[in-house]
UniProtKB/Swiss-Prot annotation:
Keywords: Ribonucleoprotein, Ribosomal protein. The gene is rplL. Forms part of the ribosomal stalk which helps the ribosome interact with GTP-bound translation factors. Is thus essential for accurate translation. GO terms for molecular function: mRNA binding; structural constituent of ribosome. SUPFAM superfamilies: ClpS-like (SSF54736), Ribosomal protein L7/12, oligomerisation (N-terminal) domain (SSF48300). This is Large ribosomal subunit protein bL12. It comes from Bordetella petrii (strain ATCC BAA-461 / DSM 12804 / CCUG 43448).
Length: 126
């Protein structure tokens, strides 16, 4: 007569911590496995998944790394993107590397990067 999974789980649920520890040791010996190795193997992918989830950003910063040769076009692009005045945009371009836009969506960051690169700037999205 085989026990069902539910019956096994009920039996385990009724055990004390000491009894569970002894059961695990006996299972390790009988089947030639280590519960610690299984725990590490299970934890490693979970940690990797957590890192992948942490890498999924929702806010991005567009950073002007270099103005490039065509500084006037870059200043115009910065003014269009930010709404800054001529002097403020020129100061931002001259002070590169500097953030142009912060806390924006990925699509907006990519569009801003494209616009600045078309003007001749070197841009990073962080």
């Amino acid at each position: 007569m085989a026990l069902s999974k539910a019956e096994i789980l009920d039996a385990i649920a009724g055990m004390t911590v000491l009894e569970l520890s002894e059961l695990i040791k006996e299972m390790e010996e009988k089947f030639g496995v280590s519960a610690a190795a299984a725990a590490v193997a299970v934890a490693a992918p979970a940690a990797g998944g957590g890192a992948a989830a942490a890498e999924e950003q929702t806010e991005f910063t567009v950073v002007l790394a270099e103005a490039g040769a065509n500084k006037v076009s870059v200043i115009k692009a910065v003014r269009e993107l930010t709404g800054l005045g001529l002097k403020e945009a020129k100061d931002l371009v001259d002070g590169a590397p500097k953030p142009v836009k912060e806390g924006i969506a990925k699509a907006d960051a990519e569009a801003a990067k494209k616009k600045l690169e078309e003007a001749g700037a070197k841009v990073e999205v962080k």
